Amino acid sequence: MQAAQSLYENGYITYMRTDSTNLSEQAVSAARSQITSLYGPDYVPEKVRTYATKSRGAQEAHEAIRPAGESFRTPEGLARELDGDRARVYELIWQRTVASQMKDANGLRTNIRFEADAGERGTAVFTTSGKVITFPGFLRAYVEGSDDPDAERGDQERLLPPLSQGQQLPVES
């Protein structure tokens, strides 16, 4: 909370003691403009995205926590001004604000079954499942949990490369 307080006091973010999910028109415009310049117009949805607060006792007198100003400074643009926790907190706020105004990601869930001749032992069968991202959408700006090095690998989705039936694959042991 000290890092966020410092960011607020120095004009980097808006008021941070709020539960609000609402962004001002100015913030939405800044986010959409930045999305277009960083990722291209294909990442901006036609309609502004709005979100409802899920908690009954939410403190919504202020708008959502976001980068301050009429245009947002990127975390990279502030690298020389912010250090340690302040840089990480700002990056998280920036990522979530920008991602909140981007199109959804699209992908295909895939189940793959590999069969290989195992000689005298018959056929070896291997299976895996995962997803292939066909359009990254908001994932270009923010992936939930990607900054958690201790996350259980088994709990994370695996990204699979595009494959075609009959394609030969290298085997590694």
At which residue positions do the language-model features occur?
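Short hinge/gating elements
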Residues: 13-20, 64-81, 171-173
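An acidic- and aromatic-residue-enriched active-site/binding cleft used to recognize and process polar
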Residues: 5-6, 12-13, 18-20, 70, ...
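Long, highly charged, low-complexity internal segments
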Residues: 1, 40-41, 54, 74, ...
